[in-house]
């Protein structure tokens, strides 16, 4: 999404919803091998700055629950999040960064 659009995504890894205990497991180094393959494939496009390594590992983790990332104009973000929450879906909605 970012590369094709010629933009940069700035994510706050602490705002990303993770599975319960995922951060603690990552701190212990319990990361699947596929995460390292993903990092090798797309790492050239990512500047992790001073992000703690365990969060970086989680971002490359190939195990997902069907997560969805959408981008909306800043002035529409609150309304979109409210709409998701009103639907009563069993999902987490979070504003995790900016374009």
Language model region names:
Residues 1-99:
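Glycine-/charge-enriched secondary-structure boundary and capping motifs
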């Amino acid at each position: 999404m970012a590369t094709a659009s010629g933009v940069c995504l700035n994510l706050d890894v602490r705002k990303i919803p993770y599975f319960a205990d995922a951060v603690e497991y990552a701190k212990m180094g319990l990361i699947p091998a596929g995460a390292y393959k993903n990092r090798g494939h797309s790492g050239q496009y990512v500047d992790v700055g001073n992000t703690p390594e365990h969060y970086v590992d989680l971002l490359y983790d190939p195990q997902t629950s069907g997560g969805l990332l959408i981008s909306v104009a800043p002035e529409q973000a609150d309304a979109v999040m409210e709409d998701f929450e009103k639907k009563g879906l069993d999902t987490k909605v979070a504003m995790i960064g900016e374009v």
